[in-house]
């Protein structure tokens, strides 16, 4: 028997499915649509979208974000990766930081007693669940008229961030650290999406400045 085929076939099968994702233009359209809504809920949803677009975080990681995780003086964001249990300290990028600031100052209910960053807009102002976040993101995608292939939830932004970093030739180890992957193997499914030629883009990652 051919040993190689017996060993490789199961590995290839595991990565056969190509993740759904969003293009750069689609993400821009979603953000531009969402930012027009300056209601408290709109400010909240826009901050969530910025965290998704900038960092590629999981919905659960954003849902469990605490007020103490945002260090405005050090300009950092502390993320507890729900799937792996790891912690990552990320730079507070301008877009995400500005959106968070506007939401916390003008959108988040003053009466909210919990320490979670994102809360529901109606009393008793409980933490926004992962399910609630999924629904909010899906509404914003639909409101922007964006029709991605496959599921229309927060993970689309995570896939897009992974692909953009792969296309920018950022090492898989760095990508894994940013996304909170348990191993570099977790980035392999995105390689199928990262094969197109793109125009020049800049991406800032701690300790790295990479251009296509």
Predicted regions and their residues:
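Conserved catalytic core of the tyrosine transesterase superfamily
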Residues: 1-212
